[in-house]
Design a protein with these regions (language model features):
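Short, solvent-exposed cationic patches
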Residues: 432-444
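Surface-exposed loop and adjacent secondary-structure segments within mature catalytic domains
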Residues: 1, 5-9, 14-35
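Active-site neighborhoods of metal-dependent hydrolases
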Residues: 19, 23-29, 36-44, 48-74, ...
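Short, well-structured alpha-helical segments that form the helix of a local strand-helix-strand
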Residues: 267-273, 343-352, 367
Length: 444
């Protein structure tokens, strides 16, 4: 019924699909026990498996689960699926095996890599269904991703369809007056203006007396402790310009720029945020940027058993704007990077054909008779992402970060043009995809 409502609710410019989310199913079956992350009983597992199989039979592409501390409830608690047992996940996977369709997807923290990967192997071996998971470079164990890639190679050699989803650039945070986070968000003096419109905040910040009060409060122990985490990592924080540089040099960090001017980094960033009516954005790459570069991303992108993924364009809308990952993939890796450039045909194949096949869509991603006429016509020399901007067009005037790109001249979906030079044409041929899709003509 939910899929039917999604498909009928509105028309779409592109196709969309659904997964069966583990968290919702676990709460439905186990109630408060599920929310408290209690172990599932055999009966609980059987009920969850039945629901997941029914969802996939109705048209969901597969089953997804989260095992990361980065995902939290609205109360800040870990999600119900964080510690779900191997028996629970294997039991659900077996149900898809009996059904003979559906993919398995996992997000996890890589803290218990050996046990987790052994569980992934069992999920695939006992179900026969393909599994993919997110893989990033951890700054605290910057070489650990290599051992994960090696495990994938061994699994593939054993006939297990396990794939890593990797990103085209660092995964990080955007900070600024219009965003959820900014370096002064915990400052009691800044709090006096925090509820004002952004332009009004910026004007208030130009008052020298107010600035002195903010910086004086920032020197206090309590504020320094509150801000001592990510929001004050000025050695790893950069101004995000237009067009944005997603592989910035350390010499362009906020700390380095302030140092060259003989200024305190906090005062320097204060003046940046107060400029341009408060529209300045700061970029804090957190994952995939150990060593201050994207060399690890290059290794992951080139690996034979990875696909591009993780382009988060619809969640954390005041902090992250990663829907432009495909643009970065082509422009940065296929054209702009000074070393480690990757062949453009390889990147296009990965982004189009390989990502589609990973989720069971064998009817698209290839320009050939019998396949979906979904394509972009790109002026490759002009292709680039623009700096994100903030819009207030969510319900109740809610805020979201959006990002445009130059260079995409035409976008066709099912043979109909839906975008022309970055603007919608009004055509809405998109549809809800139900289950795996196959071309009328098979090619290798």
């Amino acid at each position: 019924r939910r899929l039917k409502r999604i498909g009928a609710a509105r028309d779409h410019d592109i196709d969309l699909a659904a997964q069966v989310p583990h968290g919702a199913v676990r709460l439905h079956v186990m109630g408060e026990r599920g929310a408290a992350r209690e172990a599932a009983t055999a009966d609980d597992i059987a009920q969850m498996a039945e629901i997941v199989a029914a969802g996939v039979a109705a048209g969901a592409l597969g089953f997804s689960t989260s095992r990361t501390m980065n995902h939290r409830t609205s109360r800040g608690e870990p999600t119900p699926t964080l510690t779900a047992s191997e028996d629970e996940l294997v039991g659900i996977a077996r149900a898809l095996g009996r059904l003979g369709r559906g993919v398995l997807q996992v997000v996890f923290d890589h803290t218990d890599r050996d046990d987790e990967f052994d569980m992934f192997r069992r999920m695939v071996s006992e179900s026969g269904r393909p599994l993919s998971f997110s893989l990033v470079q951890n700054p605290f164990e910057p070489e650990s991703f290599r051992s994960v890639l090696a495990r994938i190679d061994r699994a593939r050699a054993d006939g297990l369809a396990i794939t890593a989803q990797v990103s085209a650039r660092a995964i990080g945070l955007l900070l600024g007056l219009p965003c959820t986070l900014n370096p002064f968000m915990n400052n009691p003096v800044f709090a006096e203006i925090a509820d004002r419109p952004v332009a009004d905040q910026a004007r208030a910040m130009t008052d020298e007396g107010f600035k002195a009060r903010v910086l004086e409060a920032a020197a206090g122990d309590k504020v320094r402790k509150l801000g001592g985490g990510l929001i004050h990592r000025f050695d790893a924080m950069f101004e995000l310009c237009d067009p944005p540089d997603y592989e910035p040099d350390a010499s362009e960090s906020i700390a380095a720029r302030a140092g060259r001017e003989g200024r305190d980094a906090l005062e320097f960033v204060y003046d940046l945020l107060a400029a341009d009516d408060g529209t300045t954005l700061l970029y804090l790459p957190a994952l995939n940027f150990a060593g201050g570069n994207l060399d690890a991303v290059e290794v992951m992108l080139r690996h034979q058993h990875t696909v591009p993924g993780l382009g988060d364009g619809g969640a954390h809308v005041g902090t992250i704007c990663d829907g432009s990952f495909p643009t970065t993939l082509l422009a940065h890796w296929g054209r702009d990077r000074q070393h480690g450039r990757i062949d453009l045909p390889f990147l296009v194949q990965r982004q189009c054909r390989d990502t589609a096949r990973t989720v069971g869509l064998f009817d698209r991603g290839v320009l050939a008779p019998g396949f979906r006429a979904d394509l972009n016509v790109i002026d490759f020399d002009q292709l680039r992402a623009r700096r994100p901007e903030v819009r207030y067009d969510l319900p109740a005037g809610g805020r979201r970060l959006v990002q445009r790109a130059d260079g995409c001249q035409h976008t066709f979906v099912a043979g109909r043009e839906v975008m022309r030079n970055g603007e919608p044409t009004g055509a809405l041929p998109g549809r809800l995809i139900r289950g795996p899709q196959f071309s009328t003509r098979r090619i290798t």
